[in-house]
Amino acid sequence: MRLLLVADVHDAAKTAERIPGNFDAVIAAGDFTYRRSLEAAVEVLEALARIAPVYFVPGNTDPPELASYENAAVKPVHGRVLPLGPYAVGGAGGSLPTPFNDLFRVAEEELERLLQRLTPTPQILVVHNPPRGVLDKVGGVRPVGSAAVRKYIEERQPAMSVHGHIHEDRGLDMLGGTIVVNPGPLKEGFYAEALLDGTKITVRLRRV
């Protein structure tokens, strides 16, 4: 299975049209629009769905009601788990409060509650907010990740965990046996590819 991993699209849906290759699904880790409306976020999701079916969580710049938007090709996994071929994908959207005018804020307790609802444990986790201490450095210095997300990954060990939010901390890391991915902001042309073959996962960072 070949997955396209994206985050922090911020209205740059046309960038996705330039991504080469075919994918079985798109895993999208939030922040689809700066325009502060459900219609704007849906417009971006529909553009991504022209590549492959989209499994997503909203980000802090997206309206909270996006978490329940769904159609045949666009599937929210905020607080729930859905099948994806032989795998399962689930997650949580929003972010811990920032100094900016967020639309979708969640406290640590809410993130923990959402993650504990994920049954069964998904092999593919998608959470806008990164785990504390992993791909979460603002300006390369200050960690702003979630302790609840880190705890969940450490305890449940999904095969892969996809995050966004911190544009400048794009990369790959490991948390126990979990591959942690920040594909980077699609707004700047960054994305990642994941190849899944049974329990083997290979992730490559790309740029359009």
Language model regions located:
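Short, charged, surface-exposed secondary-structure boundary motifs
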Residues: 35-39, 84-89, 154, 189-196
